From Swiss-Prot:
Gene: LRRTM1
Annotated InterPro entries: Leu-rich_rpt, Leu-rich_rpt_typical-subtyp, LRR_dom_sf
Extracellular side: 35-427
Membrane association type: Single-pass type I membrane protein
Cellular localisation: Cell membrane; Postsynaptic cell membrane
LRR repeat coordinates: 64-87, 89-111, 112-135, 137-159, 161-183, 184-207, 209-231, 233-255, 256-278, 279-302
Membrane side Cytoplasmic: residue ranges: 449-522
Name this protein carries in UniProt: Leucine-rich repeat transmembrane neuronal protein 1
A GO term from the CC aspect: postsynaptic membrane
GO function term, MF aspect, one: signaling receptor activity
Family from the record: Belongs to the LRRTM family.
Pfam family, one: LRR_8
Function: Exhibits strong synaptogenic activity, restricted to excitatory presynaptic differentiation, acting at both pre- and postsynaptic level.
Position of the signal peptide: 1-34
Amino acid sequence: MDFLLLGLCLYWLLRRPSGVVLCLLGACFQMLPAAPSGCPQLCRCEGRLLYCEALNPTEAPHNLSGLLGLSLRYNSLSELRAGQFTGLMQLTWLYLDHNHICSVQGDAFQKLRRVKELTLSSNQITQLPNTTFRPMPNLRSVDLSYNKLQALAPDLFHGLRKLTTLHMRANAIQFVPVRIFQDCRSLKFLDIGYNQLKSLARNSFAGLFKLTELHLEHNDLVKVNFAHFPRLISLHSLCLRRNKVAIVVSSLDWVWNLKKMDLSGNEIEYMEPHVFETVPHLQSLQLDSNRLTYIEPRILNSWKSLTSITLAGNLWDCGRNVCALASWLSNFQGRYDGNLQCASPEYAQGEDVLDAVYAFHLCEDGAEPTSGHLLSAVTNRSDLGPPASSATTLADGGEGQHDGTFEPATVALPGGEHAENAVQIHKVVTGTMALIFSFLIVVLVLYVSWKCFPASLRQLRQCFVTQRRKQKQKQTMHQMAAMSAQEYYVDYKPNHIEGALVIINEYGSCTCHQQPARECEV
């Protein structure tokens, strides 16, 4: 057909000038892709996009040339055979997730050169041949998550130079082959989380110069060596949460631009002092829920760019080794979790680290004070927010110069007892001044009253004098009454001597003489 059209074009060009137009129109029609022959029953068609979802077909539809997109989600496909999609040469995306696919042959995606997005997630795939993705060099996104992959073929991703996103989450992968991503020069996002990785090879991620985000969380890694991530110059986020990491080391001296690192939920007990010097631009660090008891001063000095850190849930030893961390926290101006509790010794268990440092005077040393404002940081910091920032005086034991580093020796609290004495003196002075001020106010009121209302003052004074006299008279009368009652009850001696009778009243006594009685005879 092509040769016939070419012959007609040449004939018309030679015979008539109008043949040029016809030739061009024919070439244009030849370049247009063929339209699909028809929409399969029970499927949904949107132009050149076909959706055959949740229909339970056992194989892919045929004779659908010209399709740009095909979705076969939520079906019962169990196998992808060689050449199964041969007639779909115009296809740009293919969704095969949520099926029962357990076997994929090496030539299953033959002639799908234009496919940019392939989704195979939520199936039962156990392995993929080396040649699986070879017919699709234009792939940008591949999703293999939630399958049963146990191993990756060494050349599985060979030739995928345009791949930018790769998902392999929630499989059973135990090892990442060396240089498996060597050709993935455009890869920016890689997720291998929720697998069974126990170790990493030094060159497992070689060639990923544009990688910005790497997920390795929920694996079985027991050691993290920053040398396993060489020359990842564009990496900004590294997630290693919920592994079994016990130590963090760096056996390769090089600098990378990492800005966010998540090491939470591990079993970290030791970190090399120089390990964070290779990431000078680190801004966010999660170290919560580990087994750290203290942090080396050299590590603290390397955290110069941090704006957020989590340290809760560790086994902090609130002895002398915690002083460097307490001093660093008191001067940290970023965000950190405030729930740092002491795990030892016994007398400090359950106490907040900074509160324990202040309450138990753990870091007092008058010789080399390294933080003059730790007291204010402890008393003024919020529970969940960052501590109060203040100017800090740093002492260098070697040369006596201030270079902005924390020495491992001690953290002094020079304001401890002196601050308490100053507070007491301040209270005494304030109370004395208040009394003097009150006395002066009373004197001022009396003076103003004496000047403005002299008659009222004289009447008031007379009332005071009169009231005082009445009180004295009442006191005298009560005393006399008490004396009379005492004589009546105490000195009275009953006798039958006829004589004078004494009558006592309130104002004095009267004497009455009684004459003896006489008997008369009748």
